[in-house]
């Protein structure tokens, strides 16, 4: 169940974010999406989710595949009057509908809450949750969706270290189950440790390959020819190829 991009150009109106991206992501890939703010990371995730259409080219997904998409927390209204369990239940809508009896899925919801450590907060309203607790609840919602492709947009922003550690373990578990996970993020150390593949977006160009091709602990690094572009760049600098920030291996 591969995810394919064929000369895909993405953007809004006359503003192009990604131009002519081609790549083939095998089922079970664990991919970090990196780039500066506004580079097009969110645009790429929205296109995969089907929320926007490519300006040119196409994105091919497996037929009947389920997709779970988690937007950035700033796009989520935490004052909406529902509790944690109800939020998690909304993950069932994609395959059982809004009005169908959801009681047969109670054990699935309970299991999801246990996996993210929120059993005791099931009846708490969203506005009482910390940033980390809200993100745990949103990950529980993804669990009940039972998706083949999981898209996460900056899932670690504004959360504590323990929550980040637990959610990274869950992401790794999803990948081990054969699910394809794409995650937009900035931290090069997290990318290096947990994500075997990555998509780097830079000035409308997107490059896909093994993370080791992008992150090198030497001063010299080479961006080899990748699927999406025949361009070969050789550079000598002390900066991370992810976001031009200082990169140190400790």
Protein language model features and the residues they cover:
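The feature captures the beta-strand-to-loop junction immediately N-terminal to the Walker
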Residues: 34-36
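Conserved ABC ATPase "signature" region
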Residues: 103-121
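Conserved ABC ATPase signature
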Residues: 125-129, 133
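Catalytic Walker B motif of ABC-type/P-loop ATPase nucleotide-binding domains
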Residues: 150-154
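H-loop/switch region of ABC-family ATPase nucleotide-binding domains
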Residues: 185-186
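H-loop (His-switch) and adjacent beta-strand-loop-beta switch element
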Residues: 196-211
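ABC ATPase nucleotide-binding domains
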Residues: 211-250
């Amino acid at each position: 169940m591969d995810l394919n991009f064929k000369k895909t150009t993405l953007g809004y109106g006359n503003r192009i974010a990604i131009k002519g991206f081609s790549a083939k992501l095998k089922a079970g890939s664990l991919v970090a999406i990196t780039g500066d703010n506004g580079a097009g990371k969110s645009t790429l995730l929205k296109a995969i989710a089907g929320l926007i259409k490519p300006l040119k080219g196409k994105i091919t997904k497996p037929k009947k595949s389920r997709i779970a998409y988690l937007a950035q927390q700033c796009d989520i209204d935490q004052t909406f009057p529902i509790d944690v369990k109800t939020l998690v239940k909304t993950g069932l809508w994609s395959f059982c509908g809004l009005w169908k009896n959801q009681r047969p899925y109670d054990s699935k919801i309970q299991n999801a809450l246990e996996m993210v450590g929120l059993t005791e907060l099931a009846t708490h309203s969203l506005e009482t949750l910390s940033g980390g607790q809200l993100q745990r609840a949103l990950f529980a919602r993804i669990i009940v969706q039972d998706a083949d492709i999981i898209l996460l947009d900056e899932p670690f922003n504004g959360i504590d270290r323990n929550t980040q550690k637990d959610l990274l373990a869950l992401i790794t578990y999803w990948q081990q189950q054969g699910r394809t996970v794409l995650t937009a993020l900035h931290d090069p150390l997290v990318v290096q440790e947990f994500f075997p593949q990555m998509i780097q977006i830079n000035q409308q160009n997107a490059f896909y390959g093994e993370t080791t091709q992008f992150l090198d602990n030497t001063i010299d690094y080479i961006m080899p020819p990748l699927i999406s572009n025949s361009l070969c760049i050789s550079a000598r600098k002390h900066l991370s190829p992810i976001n031009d920030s200082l990169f140190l291996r400790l």
